[in-house]
Amino acid sequence: LSACNETKSVTNFAWTVSDERASAELKDFCHNLTSRLEAGIMLGHKDALAYGSMWYNQPGRSDVKSVCGNYPAVVDWDLGGIESGSELNVDSIPFFRIRQYVEQVYRRNGVTILSWNPSLSSLLRKDSLQNVVRSVLSGNESRVEYEQYLDRVAVFLETLKNSDGRHIPVIVHLFHSPNLASMDWGMGHCSPEDYVRLWRMTVDYLRNKKNIHHVLYAYSMYGIVSEEEISQYYPGDKYVDIVGLNLYQDFESDESGSLYKQRLNMGLSAISRFAEANKKLPALTDTGSKGVKISNFFSSI
């Protein structure tokens, strides 16, 4: 099953769920994802049901559906803001509405991704000489506050249920692009070792303390071209289900998109090899182009 009648062939990867206590629903979800790999590529769109080109909060509407007749197979929502107790996420979408959208996507046999990349800098005391990740890992007040963040995330995940009261399986995309300096957990702010510790601590807390077992975890890197780069921050097979590439067509001198396409092919090849070797699901987790720079971006690039 794929969106927009996309039928490109994809290698069949044998992969295993990282959570040893995965719910029955999550195991079924994984089986469905595996079968879809054989069918083609699932196209995704962020905030697809909430707003689009010249519209906002119109039930049943989607830009992707308007273009090709089908809803996107994958819909991504940002959980940013939930850690502070906000009723709105960072894109000003109410969390109660995101919960409704997740259920709608589930009923259509689609896939939901929940991206969570919290601002950790607010956890750091002004007089602290540590970086924020090291502060969270050290077990002081920052750790306590961070666990409160996770408590709020867990409450939201717990409420994601279908009409039968069963948990809806979702993908949580954590701490993306650690090889970028712009992230609190990124290069220059956090060592690869501390990044791995933060990731594992986060997943362990959600699984073991909050009993969350209907989630797959996605790990992603920006613009990589080799398996060695992926390995540098990789949290380990027991903590990751999906290995992804993030890459935007953001090159001022790349008007044709040829450089983007070259880097995309190299990155996806590396991701696919790494995923196959580690029995994980490969994905292009984040991509796009700001504005309509290339008219055939989706059809040819």
Tell where the protein language model's regions lie, with residue ranges:
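C-terminal motif of bacterial Sec signal peptides marking the signal peptidase cleavage site
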Residues: 2-3
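Alpha-helical scaffolding within the catalytic cores
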Residues: 28, 55-64, 96-100, 155-156, ...
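Acidic (Asp/Glu)-rich catalytic clusters
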Residues: 34, 62-70, 99-109, 157-167, ...
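Conserved, mostly hydrophobic/aromatic
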Residues: 75, 172, 241-243
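Substrate-binding cleft of extracellular glycoside hydrolase catalytic domains
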Residues: 80, 84-208, 212
